[in-house]
Amino acid sequence: MSASKYKNLLKPLDLGFTTLKNRLIMGSMHTGIEEFGVLKGGHNQRGGLAPLARYFEERAKGGVGLIVTGGIAPNREGKVSPWAGKMSNKLESRAHRDITEAVHRHDSKIVMQILHAGRYGYHFWNVAPSPIKAPI
C-alpha cells in the first residue's frame, strides 16, 4: 500500500459530534461472543460481557478508529436465537459499559449495530411480517 495513495487513512476524521482518531473502521461481524444472556449483575456462566469487552479492546489497541459491533437485538422478539444478545433495559445497558470503556481507553470509538432478526429468528416468540422461517 502506497502511503501517498492513502494519505488520509491515518488522519483524524471530524464527524461534527465526535472525531475519529483515524479512518480505519472494523465492520460488523457476528462472533458468537454477543450471545451472553445478561443476568443479575450482567454476568452469566460464560462470564457475561467480559469476553466481548476483551475482544473489542484488542481491536482498539490495534489502532482501529471505529468499531461496529455484531448485531444486538432491541427486544426479546428481535433476537436471532433464545440466547442471543439484546439491549432493552437499564441492566443490559449498564452491562455494555465495560465494552465501551475498554474501547475508549485506547482512543477508539464503538457503535452498536441494532439487529431485529425478524423471520431469521429461531425461537418461539419472534415477530416478523411472515410466520415462515427464513431458509438460512
What are these regions (language model features)?
Residues 26, 59, 63, 103, ...:
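Conserved, mostly hydrophobic/aromatic
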Residues 15-16, 23-46:
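N-terminal binding-site loop/beta-alpha segment at the start of enzyme catalytic domains
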Residues 35-58, 85-105, 124:
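Glycine-rich anion/phosphate-binding loops
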Residues 50-75:
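Catalytic domains of carbohydrate-active enzymes, especially glycoside hydrolases
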Residues 66-92, 114-127:
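Glycine-rich, proline-tolerant flexible connector loops at the mouths of alpha/beta enzymes
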Residues 101-104, 109, 115-136:
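Non-globular sequence segments
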Residues 21-22, 64-65, 107-109:
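Loop/turn elements at helix/coil->beta-strand transitions in domains of secreted/extracellular proteins
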Residues 2-28, 103:
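N-terminal amphipathic alpha-helix/helix-capping segment at the start of soluble metabolic enzymes
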